[in-house]
Structures are given as C-alpha cells and as structure tokens.
Amino acid sequence: YYSKSLSVYIEDKFSRAAPGGAGYAKAAGNYGAAFYPTTLAMAKGFDQVVWTDSTNHQKIEEVGTMSIAFRINDKLVTPLTSDTILDGVSRKTVIQVAKDIGIDVEERDITVQELIKKYDEGSLKEIFGCGTAAVIAKISSFGYKEDKFEIEDVSDSYADKIKESIVKIQQNLAEDPHGWRYKVEE
C-alpha cells in the first residue's frame, strides 16, 4: 500500500474527530476534515498527519486513516479507543497478533510530550500505523511544530513481525487460531 516508510506531522490545530461525534465509526465523512490539514502537512514535506484530541491537541489518536502504535522499549503502546478513535478490526488484529507472538501490549493515552520525551530518552523504538489496506505502515519520522524526529530502523522490528504474522494468516500460510479466515466456495 505504501511503498516506503512514512513521515508524519503531529497536528496541533485541526481535528479529525470531536467528542460526541462519530469518530469511532468507519464512516467516509469522518475523513473529509483530514484533506486540508493533510495538504498543509504534505507542503511541509510530510506524508500523513498524526491526529490529536480536539480539546487541547495533546493526546495522540490516529495517523491518517489508520490506528497508531508505538514501541516504547519492548512494549507496544496504542491509544485507548474512545468516541474519537476507531476500535477497528485492524487495530484489534494487531493487538491480538502482538500478544500471540509474545509482545507486551498496553492500551492507554499517550501524549505528544510523552512521545517526544521517550524519543529523547532513546526508548521510542518504532512507530507504525495499521489499517485495512496498509496492514502495517512503518513511520520513519515525525514532526511537531518546527522540529523533526527521525526514527532509526531496528533489527527486531515489531511492525515487521506483526505484519508477517498477519499476512501469513491471510494467505493461509500459518494457523488461524482465532477463526478469522472463512472458506469461500462457489
């Protein structure tokens, strides 16, 4: 889906979804508000936008049209779902497969300030998005205000391990312990 790792910009003015809306649903209208801010981010040299909460733009919610996950040390951290974050099947699949292969997963709020702090400490190892079309989209850098932060590749990438496991299940090359595949017959 994406031919390269993404560079993303953390949005601190515009919002994709607001409390009381339908941001939790996979609805086309939820992404119309993304066009203009994404165009602005692209003009700055970024591929996608990291969406933050509409109240104070501090809690990270999603990236582009995907769920977002962070590897902090050896833990996979992803934002809690809410009325502004889609509790989608791709997100659920990534969480389950990560647990299946022995990765510790934590669902909780993560703020922009925490992300930058973890980056500065060297404990932010990976960022990736997950969605239906992309499965997993690795993120190689993120921008916030005037700063840009580069994420170095890691040899034991959680994103690669999770994607490989999901694709093998999809292609019937691995067991499907969760009953996700359905045989289609004529």
Predicted region positions:
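Helix-start/capping segments and mature chain N-termini
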Residues: 1-186
